[in-house]
Amino acid sequence: MTNIRKTHPLMKIVNNAFIDLPTPSNISSWWNFGSLLGICLILQILTGLFLAMHYTSDTMTAFSSVTHICRDVNYGWIIRYMHANGASMFFICLFMHVGRGLYYGSYTFLETWNIGVILLLATMATAFMGYVLPWGQMSFWGATVITNLLSAIPYIGTNLVEWIWGGFSVDKATLTRFFAFHFILPFIIAALAMVHLLFLHETGSNNPTGIPSDTDKIPFHPYYTIKDILGAMLLILVLMLLVLFTPDLLGDPDNYIPANPLNTPPHIKPEWYFLFAYAILRSIPNKLGGVLALVLSILILVLMPFLHTSKQRSMMFRPISQCMFWILVADLLTLTWIGGQPVEHPYIIIGQLASIMYFLIILVMMPAASTIENNLLKW
């Protein structure tokens, strides 16, 4: 008799995706981040659901409703901090996942990669709108500054911003719609993640060598399920260390001050995971130019498959490209640091140089390094 998991219409899908899935035998821990992102998403949806039961999306009561969650709701404080720090863990996993894709040439799976970029953008939009909800100073001014960037779009900009605001400034209408979008987007992300997996399973996983592994596959369960459980345990450990010992480490103290349209904070800055893009935005003295650079800093990922000039897929055997990759990582860390600094000398020039380097490495130096390596190998 055939096993029910292989015949039942619903269980068959789960079986083919997580149990009997043929997987390369040599994928490293860098391949753990997909499952970790799934865990992060489930965790965010669950904690978010419980927060939404007590939150009110009204400018008069939003801030006090968050205070009420932390003080009066049973275990409300832990749910709130798990949600806030869960977002940080989500982005750490996202950046690692994208970095893995760049290093090992996973972007040659075009559909999977492009849906991944859409997922990244959707997650960034969700996180931005979530940051507005507590209605602290940084929530209000962050929303004002970032939505105002759209006014740089010629002709329709101002009308577009007022349409998004639902008025002439960030107010009750803005907060209510941001809450609505923040609630619905994670479910759209979950659906997109399924499509992401669907396209991945059409081709099968890449592996560290970048060489087709059809001759050497092993079942996903038990080998990679146990490996994913280890990764999940480490993720939960780091998250709970953050939540229980330093819950405000990655937050901004200004967000404990209720939103006040008459008082601007000394340094308006987004959450740490947006700082690299914020630094690129600030490094260009022109508004429209800055907005374009900001958008391109993420959308440049779409170009990665077309910038791949190497005859090899992975960087595993390409030392010059490896150097370029790690210089890019260092550059992104520099941009993240600069994004959190005030706009003054020497931070301005460092930010401008790091921004130029970012685009230069991706658009010029990495393809050039690949071409040099091809010539060295006489390919």
From Swiss-Prot:
One of its GO terms (molecular function) is metal ion binding. Gene3D superfamilies: Cytochrome Bc1 Complex, Chain C. Its cofactor is heme b. Its main location: mitochondrion. Keywords: Electron transport, Heme, Iron, Membrane, Metal-binding, Mitochondrion, Mitochondrion inner membrane, Respiratory chain, Transmembrane, Transmembrane helix, Transport, Ubiquinone. One of its GO terms (biological process) is mitochondrial electron transport, ubiquinol to cytochrome c. It is a multi-pass membrane protein. It is found in: Mitochondrion inner membrane. It comes from the Eukaryota. GO terms for cellular component: mitochondrial inner membrane; respiratory chain complex III. The chain crosses the membrane at residues 33-53, 77-98, 113-133, 178-198, 226-246, 288-308, 320-340, 347-367. A ubiquinone binds at H201. Binds 2 heme b groups non-covalently. Heme b b566 binds at H97, H196. Heme b b562 binds at H83, H182. It holds the Pfam family Cytochrome_B. The keyword Transmembrane helix applies. Heme 1 (or BL or b562) is low-potential and absorbs at about 562 nm, and heme 2 (or BH or b566) is high-potential and absorbs at about 566 nm. Component of the ubiquinol-cytochrome c reductase complex (complex III or cytochrome b-c1 complex) that is part of the mitochondrial respiratory chain. The b-c1 complex mediates electron transfer from ubiquinol to cytochrome c. Contributes to the generation of a proton gradient across the mitochondrial membrane that is then used for ATP synthesis. The cytochrome bc1 complex contains 11 subunits: 3 respiratory subunits (MT-CYB, CYC1 and UQCRFS1), 2 core proteins (UQCRC1 and UQCRC2) and 6 low-molecular weight proteins (UQCRH/QCR6, UQCRB/QCR7, UQCRQ/QCR8, UQCR10/QCR9, UQCR11/QCR10 and a cleavage product of UQCRFS1). This cytochrome bc1 complex then forms a dimer. Belongs to the cytochrome b family. This is Cytochrome b. It comes from Capra falconeri (Markhor). The gene is MT-CYB.
